[in-house]
């Protein structure tokens, strides 16, 4: 497997990617939290960033979103080198982040949350009719037909609240949408709802960065896959270069599972029985070797 990522243009596109990082890294004091990360995000594509806890996903998000600055490598937005001082600067460049703990006020109506901090005024008063009408239309464009945008947003399902946040970011000019674990706290049905919204955002020409630890959610919607482990790049693939099973295997840590299986087997008794079960699961996942290793 080739773990050194290479940046390639998608299809025949000649325009600069919306976002490009080359050999980017971040230090926290003496701790190297992120090292050698290269990725690109183009309009109309979903780039999935996968990794377990502590892989470096949050650090990567914070660099792209303007919360932290990178210490190594380069970061470009539409071909322009950048080093943001704040999330507002990133937002001004069209980079919006939807975090797992959504920035919504549960008791406020849907339309108030949609325009929160960006209220439209007609003279000295808020233009309530415009904001209600716009909220309903924008949500409908994303596939949610709310009967009443005056209902508290807390009454919506988790997937629907994610949709409101995504739709809000699109309406206010996002070109790149960073989604931080949007399906982590959702059930199967609501996860499917969010994945459909991700596809719709891609079809509207946005570049989407989908942060997740779940390859089964990433693979159906992703065009590129960046795998991180302990701050380093484990692999960077386009969709035609890796299967879902291989992606799952890399996430599951095939080599580590095989090593554990051998350790258990040498212990005999119940440990050996557990090793046989684990070995069967490893084979079923098709892990233990990297894509292209054969």
Please annotate each region the language model reported.
Residues 2-294:
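Glycine-rich phosphate-binding loops of nucleotide-dependent enzymes
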